[in-house]
Amino acid sequence: MPLKFRIKHTLDRMRVGKVKTRHGSFETPVFIPVATLAAIRGLDNRDLKDMGVEVILANTYHLHLRPGDELIKELGGLHKFMNFDGVIVTDSGGFQAFSLGFGMEHGVGKIANNIFLEELREERLREAENERKKLAVVTDRGVRFKDPKSGRIVELTPKKSMEIQSNLGSDIIFAFDECTSPLSDRDYTEKALERTHRWAEECLQHYDRRQALFGVVQGGEYRDLREKSARFMAERDFAGYGIGGSLGKSKQDMLNILDWVIPLLPEEKPRHLLGIGAIEDLFNCTEKGVDMYDCVAPARWARRGHLYVSPAEGGNVRNKFRIHIKNAAFRIDNRPVDRTCDCLVCQNYSRAYLRHLYKANELLYFRLATYHNIYFVVKLMERIRESIADGSFYELKREWLGF
């Protein structure tokens, strides 16, 4: 078996587990940093090891374009290529169909939030006229991408996705799926779900048996479609299950989707909530039974000047547990970013110094900020695991979220 999952502790719907693969193991629930192009900007593998990062996620679509999955295979696979001795997860490339297509056109993500939904839904009817402008177009066969750098057309199909992920040599791979928009109506979501299910069957036929294949539950905000998809995936021999977007119009919609889906998935297999990683979500979704998360947010927010802080430093749901280091208040602030954090940044540098680096656009800022944010989330997940094991999760959640 390319993957073994052992549940060590449970608390209500939560579990602490251990995933074992051919390139090592990791504890769950886990936050997985995203190394899109086989790298996390500003960090090297020694940094990841120092943080305790045991698993990363790389992007199939982007690595296929550059440097090319066949080249990576020639060089011994991703582990050797990037000299990483931990577990590597690759996505299927399906999310790019959304982010480079409808998502790019309308500027929305997996959760719609405060946008003019009905007005934008009407635009779906005019999509055919605008397809030439998009970088990605979905068909029943797969997805056609326009490489934004070279302009060449690339077609990604379920079989091709499995081939690329095999060449990359990752440990955990995902079935090719269509991630619909929060703006998609029921008719489109249902058709997309039928495609996702057909593509999942194709992936089961063509994937590399040395890898652990996860199926992806889709269905948008519609309960019956989500439940249909969860049952479909649960009946197939996947090593684990991803829960994909769209995740509705609000955080509550996302939690409702987890309530519908998770009870229908096999208890003995891991569940991965794709593309989610906000501090609030790590608590609330773990409470629903999620085991794995991946998200670019910690690194992306770091580059934009937002650094994570704990409740002891004023972090809360309203400020999303972040301070913006460019604020003038930090100009003469000799405190570390977070006095409760023992990362190398908080042990050695002040807020004033980090603000100076950020304002001066110094490269060192990006390394230090990214290090702090990823370390912060990785260590928070350690605390969450410990709290599930010793029964103190709800106290920890109350300390952080206030409820």
From Swiss-Prot:
The active site lies at D91 (proton acceptor), D294 (nucleophile)
**Region RNA binding, residue ranges:** 275-281, 299-303
Q: How is the cofactor bound?
A: Binds 1 zinc ion per subunit.
Tell me its cofactors: Zn(2+)
Chain positions recorded as Zn(2+) binding sites: C341, C343, C346, H372
Task: List its EC numbers.
Answer: 2.4.2.29
List, alphabetically, the GO terms of the cellular component aspect.
cytosol
The catalysed reaction is: 7-aminomethyl-7-carbaguanine + guanosine(34) in tRNA = 7-aminomethyl-7-carbaguanosine(34) in tRNA + guanine
**GO terms for MF:** metal ion binding; tRNA-guanosine(34) queuine transglycosylase activity
For this chain's UniProt record, which GO biological process terms are given? Answer: queuosine biosynthetic process; tRNA wobble guanine modification; tRNA-guanine transglycosylation
**Where on this chain does substrate bind?**
D91, S92, G93, G94, F95, D177, Q218, G245
Q: Pfam family of this protein, just one?
A: TGT
Keyword annotations for this protein, in alphabetical order, are: Glycosyltransferase, Metal-binding, Transferase, tRNA processing, Zinc
Family statement drawn from the similarity comment of this UniProt entry? Belongs to the queuine tRNA-ribosyltransferase family.
- So what does this one do? Catalyzes the base-exchange of a guanine (G) residue with the queuine precursor 7-aminomethyl-7-deazaguanine (PreQ1) at position 34 (anticodon wobble position) in tRNAs with GU(N) anticodons (tRNA-Asp, -Asn, -His and -Tyr). Catalysis occurs through a double-displacement mechanism. The nucleophile active site attacks the C1' of nucleotide 34 to detach the guanine base from the RNA, forming a covalent enzyme-RNA intermediate. The proton acceptor active site deprotonates the incoming PreQ1, allowing a nucleophilic attack on the C1' of the ribose to form the product.
Assembly, per entry = Homodimer. Within each dimer, one monomer is responsible for RNA recognition and catalysis, while the other monomer binds to the replacement base PreQ1.
Q: What is this protein called?
A: Putative queuine tRNA-ribosyltransferase
Q: Which organism is it from?
A: Archaeoglobus fulgidus (strain ATCC 49558 / DSM 4304 / JCM 9628 / NBRC 100126 / VC-16)
